[in-house]
Amino acid sequence: MSRCPDLCRRDNPSHSHHTTTMTTVAPTQTIPVKVLKKSSRPKDNWYYWEDVAHDLDGISLPKSVKDEILACSLEYTRTVIPHWTNRARYVAFMRIIIMGIIAEFKGDLLDVTKGDNVLNYSLDGVLSDLFTGTPDPAGMAREYKTFLLCSGDKSSGRRSGEFFRRYVNNLAHSPRRYFRMRDSDALCRFTIAVALACGDHDDVWFTNEQFDFLAELGDTMYDAVSFFKHRSEGETNSTFAYAPSDLRVAAFKQCREVLWALNAAWNDRPEMACVTSFLRYFGGPLHMMMRRYRYVEEDMTMGREEDSEIVDQTRNNYKLWNRIDASKQRDQDADSVEKKRYENIVAHGDSLLFPGLARWLEDEGEGHCDTCLYCPSYGAETTHCFGGVELCESCRPQWRDHVLSFRERAAKVFPELRPVYKRAAEDIIAPASKRTCVEATKAATENAPASPDSGVCV
């Protein structure tokens, strides 16, 4: 990921001056892009439950787009939570996903800071339908409102505001902080809680540390598969925009193996099946089954590099994707309004933000490093790059170390993994050196080129 120096600057706590208006010419395209002939979209038949068929009546979107949103909500719900016993909660989750889809590509249609009415829903009412009687309904409500707030700002004119700038600056603080924020952005712990609720497992819960680990596992796998999708979107919240992209394949392999180890460890706990099922589908098969992804359009492949046609389609919300282009101008008049909005969000952080986020935004919203590259407004400047903070050379190693330590960290959070690790059947085709996954990954990647689309097989 590279930055245009005319568009970004190092905004750090040590700088007392802040640019409020900035105009530049469009950056020069330096990477050759293969332009493909525009292809027509194949015909789709959309299916969704009657329960939600009229949920978007009166919303300012074309009927064809509404149909696609409703179908997408069904496909996601049925894929990541294939089994349910509580139908009312299941329908409530479909409505959660409908709101979430719109937040991700048409954020101007909603703003959670303006009250309980979101689209045609009572947000608190839907959340109550989903989590009443579960261990932490208030915590899950905060989790989802954080998602709506950040996703809605990212895909709207509010993206250049004070809140989103401070939010993205914090993503680059550390791997641990990033994964907690990515957890909310991907609704990972939230959907694990939903899976338990929809199966009526109201007495099953995880510690915060366990939720952190499960979310990191799911998000790492999802982001590894979605690498090129996220680049085509100019995404700010993508794991391998910060962690070394040359570890993408090895990280997926490592997480997949730990997920299967969890399946073995929980063999006598049927209530955990919905948790591992979510992580398994979220981490890969989702991209094959949902029409929101390009598996069919790309000849039944995953991991194909984006081109200018895909970026243009993303900019036009094809498949409900959203392109985050770098802003060429920051509106000085809007700055004071956005500053007040940010202050209001922080003041109501105990209901709008997950615990700890308001403090992070206040304490380190200007960034934590004097040499990482921060921006007054975030987005991708050209094709083949992400839209967030660019890490400096001294900050990069901690991300590599964090990724490579995943297997050991997993066993500390879930000690039941240790005996599973010990009794694992060794692949007889594996190298005779019998290196651990981490050792093999380190050996394979120590001198690997840091190209944005390279991968390491171990």
Question: Language model features by range: what are they?
Answer:
Residues 1-458:
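Alpha-helical, largely C-terminal catalytic domains
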